[in-house]
């Protein structure tokens, strides 16, 4: 089984062909093709190769499925006896992609 580890938006993802991954928003239309070139490691036919920092000539081809927003996460801070509190919400914008091909 071949897999790859790539970096996108400050995070690292381990994927195989056919996986569906939520990435940071990329402003792409559905069915658009995306190339992810910051590949840190690739395993093909049992042979593992690491990059310094990226693997030369390696890329991951993916197809955009859709874009959306995640569930709301609420942060709440309260300081006792001061009637001081803060409530803040955050929703992550994401792009859902399907990994179609790992090129090494």
UniProtKB/Swiss-Prot annotation:
The keyword Transcription does not apply. PROSITE patterns: RIBOSOMAL_L21. Keywords: Ribonucleoprotein, Ribosomal protein, RNA-binding, rRNA-binding. GO terms for biological process: translation. Transmembrane segments: none annotated. The keyword rRNA-binding applies. GO terms for cellular component: cytoplasm; ribonucleoprotein complex; ribosome. One of its GO terms (molecular function) is rRNA binding. This protein binds to 23S rRNA in the presence of protein L20. Belongs to the bacterial ribosomal protein bL21 family. Part of the 50S ribosomal subunit. Contacts protein L20. This is Large ribosomal subunit protein bL21.
């Amino acid at each position: 089984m071949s897999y790859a580890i790539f970096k996108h938006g400050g995070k690292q993802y381990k994927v195989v062909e056919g996986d569906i991954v939520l990435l940071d928003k990329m402003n792409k239309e559905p069915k658009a093709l995306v190339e992810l070139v910051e590949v840190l490691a690739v395993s093909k036919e049992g042979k593992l190769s690491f990059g310094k920092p990226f693997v030369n000539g390696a890329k991951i081809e993916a197809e955009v499925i859709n874009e959306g927003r995640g569930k709301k996460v609420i942060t709440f801070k309260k300081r006792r006896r001061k009637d001081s509190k803060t409530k803040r919400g955050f929703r992550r914008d994401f792009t859902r992609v399907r990994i179609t091909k790992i090129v090494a």
